[in-house]
Amino acid sequence: MKLRAEDVLANGTSRHKVQIDMERQVQIAKDLLAQKKFLEAAKRCQQTLDSLPKDGLLPDPELFTIFAQAVYNMEVQNSGNLFGDALLAGDDGSGSESESEPESDVSNGEEGNENGQTEIPNSRMFQFDQEEEDLTGDVDSGDSEDSGEGSEEEEENVEKEEERLALHELANFSPANEHDDEIEDVSQLRKSGFHIYFENDLYENALDLLAQALMLLGRPTADGQSLTENSRLRIGDVYILMGDIEREAEMFSRAIHHYLKALGYYKTLKPAEQVTEKVIQAEFLVCDALRWVDQVPAKDKLKRFKHAKALLEKHMTTRPKDSELQQARLAQIQDDIDEVQENQQHGSKRPLSQPTTSIGFPALEKPLGDFNDLSQLVKKKPRRH
């Protein structure tokens, strides 16, 4: 059968053949991730992405999400983070320890320095150090008694105010009527040289890979088309993954930003049990990160905690099948409510740098499919520095 011109790539390869091979590589990488062979999974994704033809065949977004999870878990292994919850494909929730191999020590020399390196995507997500969020805009503007203490204090106050304003705008974000400026045109997509993602800060590398997955999932917007239900669902799932990585890296405000973005996408979907569960999960994760953001006033934390508590209680009356998980979440949120109320009376006793507990990390069992967080029923104590 003679192939049509549009079915043949510039190098003479069948477009269909390349697509089939890419799907096979995705499945292999997913299996490696499930086996906790993080370096092998990451290299499989890197080599697949670098080998794709550059003339119009777009990568499967899942190559980027698997790559991101593998790189993230390599960093967890490198840092000896005993409290880090891995983002795994096919995690059965058993909580069994991985037989970690020394595979996370990557040699940069193995890949070599390639010619023709393309620029890293111009992702806006890294602006959030100054553009992070808070839950409300109507916040008292500080108790600064030492006016003129120095430019550092003034800059810090400006950043806090920008954070408050940014989150106030984001709390009601909906992609149905607002442009998502984190989803850039695919022309910004990296084309080759993916070995760089084994270097430097692997947390940020994982986030950048997820940002590229967003470019691919959101690409219909460049043609003025509406995103499909499935695309919005998968974009929401990518934002959850971003939030989980940021939360584990103690970038709590950035995590809240992306959990709220996920909520914005989930709330545009048609009502369904899966959607309801994702909304519940995202609401809980906002609270899980929020407890560590000191810039948010206690009254606004209480609003969010009580909102999540009411959602959980309502959900538990109609969905008893996962009541054990929801009970654990409910107990944690009630603890948060009690702590905020106690702090209002007696002042905070929590060290500023304590990271969060982790209930609800997602696991990919199929392309950005259902999240499996049943392994997180035991509430862990935050690690201390």
Swiss-Prot record:
The modification Phosphoserine is found at S174. Residues 248-332 are annotated as: Interaction with dimeric histone H2A and H2B. Residues 85-163, 340-385 are annotated as: Disordered. Disulfide bonds: none annotated. Residues 80-199 are annotated as: Important for interaction with heterotetrameric histone H3 and H4 and for interaction with dimeric histone H2A and H2B. Changing E250A: Strongly reduces affinity for dimeric histone H2A and H2B. GO terms for cellular component: chromosome, telomeric region; histone acetyltransferase complex; nucleus. Histone H3 and H4 specific chaperone component of the nuclear histone acetyltransferase B (HAT-B) complex. Involved in chromatin assembly and telomere silencing. Present with 4550 molecules/cell in log phase SD medium. The N-terminal TPR repeat region contains an acidic patch that is important for interaction with histones. A C-terminal, highly polar region mediates interaction with dimeric histone H2A and H2B, but is not involved in interaction with heterotetrameric histone H3 and H4. Belongs to the NASP family. This is HAT1-interacting factor 1. It comes from Saccharomyces cerevisiae (strain ATCC 204508 / S288c). The gene is HIF1.
